[in-house]
Amino acid sequence: MYGSARSVGKVEPSSQSPGRSPRLPRSPRLGHRRTNSTGGSSGNSVGGGSGKTLSMENIQSLNAAYATSGPMYLSDHENVGAETPKSTMTLGRSGGRLPYGVRMTAMGSSPNIASSGVASDTIAFGEHHLPPVSMASTVPHSLRQARDNTIMDLQTQLKEVLRENDLLRKDVEVKESKLSSSMNSIKTFWSPELKKERALRKDEASKITIWKEQYRVVQEENQHMQMTIQALQDELRIQRDLNQLFQQDSSSRTGEPCVAELTEENFQRLHAEHERQAKELFLLRKTLEEMELRIETQKQTLNARDESIKKLLEMLQSKGLSAKATEEDHERTRRLAEAEMHVHHLESLLEQKEKENNMLREEMHRRFENAPDSAKTKALQTVIEMKDSKISSMERGLRDLEEEIQMLKSNGALSTEEREEEMKQMEVYRSHSKFMKNKIGQVKQELSRKDTELLALQTKLETLTNQFSDSKQHIEVLKESLTAKEQRAAILQTEVDALRLRLEEKETMLNKKTKQIQDMAEEKGTQAGEIHDLKDMLDVKERKVNVLQKKIENLQEQLRDKEKQMSSLKERVKSLQADTTNTDTALTTLEEALADKERTIERLKEQRDRDEREKQEEIDTYKKDLKDLKEKVSLLQGDLSEKEASLLDLKEHASSLASSGLKKDSRLKTLEIALEQKKEECLKMESQLKKAHEATLEARASPEMSDRIQQLEREIARYKDESSKAQTEVDRLLEILKEVENEKNDKDKKIAELESLTSRQVKDQNKKVANLKHKEQVEKKKSAQMLEEARRREDSLSDSSQQLQVEELLMAMEKVKQELESMKAKLSSTQQSLAEKETHLTNLRAERRKHLEEVLEMKQEALLAAISEKDANIALLELSSSKKKTQEEVAALKREKDRLVQQLKQQTQNRMKLMADNYEDDHFRSSRSNQTNHKPSPDQDEEEGIWA
């Protein structure tokens, strides 16, 4: 209250003046405690309280008046008051610390800013984040809330002022107790009290500097008050412009009901005006910084004056004044200056309260003459009584102080020069306080005029609230439509998730298909190996057929030889006929025998020709079968190549399906992003509809909103079509996958059928080859029998000795054949047992080789471990201290190590020999197997030997 300083809307801690002391308290409590703890003697703080905008009584009266007029909700604004510093308070201004380019519309009545408090970092100079729609659409809302916000700020100011009063009372009591104790101590025992007074003097000098800083802060507050007045004037000018706009819009609404109230041009114009005001505030901020620099220079001049005053006082003290007299003189001057300052402050408070009472009475008559309320009048009467009682108490205190001042003046022994200087300072402070009072009066007049304009705008606000309620209904309808669209979007999202799951399943199926394709490729390799084996078998069969053809040719040559023998026999018979003419009967018998032989020969020839034809037919059939088999093999190879190509196509198709799935995922993501963008656009439209100032009829009739809604619906329909197209495409891909799977299954079936066919054909061919062998053997036996019969007949025709020889030979031949057959059976059985034994032997050799290698490895490892152990022992012994023993032990260990190294070398040589033997055995076995494979069968050998 006495010297309290309140800063108005400081920008940042960095925007403070550089000369401000960092110890200067930000809260008013600490400031009052420091300024009024002992009461300084300087007159710089006179009129320091004149920078305040409203007194406590005026605040209480306004609070009571507004409290009875309507409900107040402290809970809605307690957070704002708690966050803001208590040292930043002005009328109609926000308690928050905002930059100079920003106004809190919760305090003022600016129509072009949102009604809620905006953070300082979002509304800086050059960054206007508020849209033009919100600037114009929230005018009635801000006008409605201006009163409530001012009431809340006034309540907070009232609470702070009450706290300050309590603190100041306590400080005054403490000061009085200190002064009384100091006076008593000076009277009783002054020598130790002088030391205390010197310490007090030092404290007073420091407090004088603090008061000077507070005086500078008061000057800054005055400048801020001027800036607030300018801001209020700007706001009033903006309100006038808005009133003109409202009038123009109302006139245009009567003439053209379909046209909207506020066009984009008006919004742009208001936005430009808002930017211009921000620029003006920026310029004001610069001027404020310049004023702070000036204040800094003034502070320096004041410090120089204080130093000169201190020097003069020291000179006066050094001239011969007694310490006690100077101390008493200084104490009296201090008390006198403090009392005069207090009186001046009380006078200013009385004047302010009288003015405030008059203004409150005028406001009471003006606001409540139409609708008087008993509760409001009672509250105002109580407030007035409180004010009167406070005024009377203050007048009594003022009289007491005046009496005290007179007593001090009469008792005091102040020097004339100091009194003149103090009087000059008092006059300067009084003139400055009068100037500030005039400024405050102007501000109050502006505020009263603004209240009248607010009342005028409230009538307009009621008309706009009805329109706003209609627009709210329309917004609710739009909200319902938006919720429906959001539900559709959610359904689409679920469908998209389902599609993703299906795509993942398809990817797993594709992976399975790739695995199956790999398995098919492996099966194809195995089938190719089997086909290669079949080709080898066919080559073997062809070789056998060639051998049979050679045998047939040999048989034909033998038949030719037999015919030659027959012709020779005939010649002998003819010679015998010529020689033995006597034996006709023998000749006839011989002729008959010859005829029989010729018949048998012809029959044999016919049978031979028939056999040759049958053999040729069988050979032709075999050749045809071979050709068919080759064709089938080529067909199988073609099918395999086709299957390989189809497998490659399937892989490419699977990769294309995977790429298409990825494309679908990206497309679905783009669709989701587009849906989110459309949702954001819908939300923006909703906010625009909320902030719009038009009525529901104009909003429904406005073509822009309907077009926007239709456009959104069209876009949603388009997105639905795109999602349906994506669904159809996914279904198409699924069908393609099913077709591919069916084709793969068909091809698998075909491959299995071909494998079964090839196996059957191989079996049939083996059977045919076996039948051919059997037939050949039977034919050979038959031909041999026939030849034997022919020989017998020839031998019977010849001498009996020859017959006996032929019979013996035939018997020997049969025995040899039987022996050969038994030998063949034995040979086959022995070959089988030999093969089994060879396999068993190879297995045993492999096991023996493994065991030997393991044993050699174990021995080598054991030897290496022993050698490493010996090396470690040798190293330890070499490191030990005793030399003789260690040398002997080292030598013994080295001998053992050499022996182990020799054993290791021998083991490695044995292992190398074993590996070489194994290699030679394998090489010998492979060469032997090749020889056995290329060696002809014993049947062939026998047949060739027989017919050689």
From Swiss-Prot:
Q: List the disulfide bonds.
A: none
GO CC terms of this entry: anchoring junction; centrosome; ciliary basal body; cytoplasm; GABA-ergic synapse; glutamatergic synapse; Golgi membrane; IkappaB kinase complex
Q: Which residues form a coiled coil?
A: 144-920
> InterPro entries under this entry?
ELKS/CAST
One Pfam family matching this protein: Cast
Which keywords belong to this entry? Acetylation, Cell junction, Cell projection, Coiled coil, Cytoplasm, Cytoskeleton, Golgi apparatus, Membrane, Phosphoprotein, Protein transport, Synapse, Transport
Name the reported effect of A948L. Weakens RIMS1 and abolishes RIMS2 binding
Q: What is the effect of changing G945 to D/A?
A: Abolishes RIMS1 and RIMS2 binding
Q: What is the membrane topology here?
A: Peripheral membrane protein
Q: Which positions bear N6-acetyllysine? A: K10
Q: What is the effect of changing A948D?
A: Abolishes RIMS1 and RIMS2 binding
Tissue specificity note? Isoform 1 is specifically expressed in brain. A further probable isoform is widely expressed outside of brain It is referred to as ERC1a by PubMed:12391317 and characterized by a C-terminus identical to that of isoforms 1 in human and mouse.
Consequence recorded when altering W947 to D/A: Abolishes RIMS1 and RIMS2 binding
Composition bias (Basic and acidic residues) maps to 773-796
Q: Which PANTHER family match?
A: ELKS/RAB6-INTERACTING/CAST PROTEIN, ELKS_RAB6-INTERACTING_CAST FAMILY MEMBER 1
Q: Provide the protein name.
A: ELKS/Rab6-interacting/CAST family member 1
Say which species the protein is native to: Rattus norvegicus
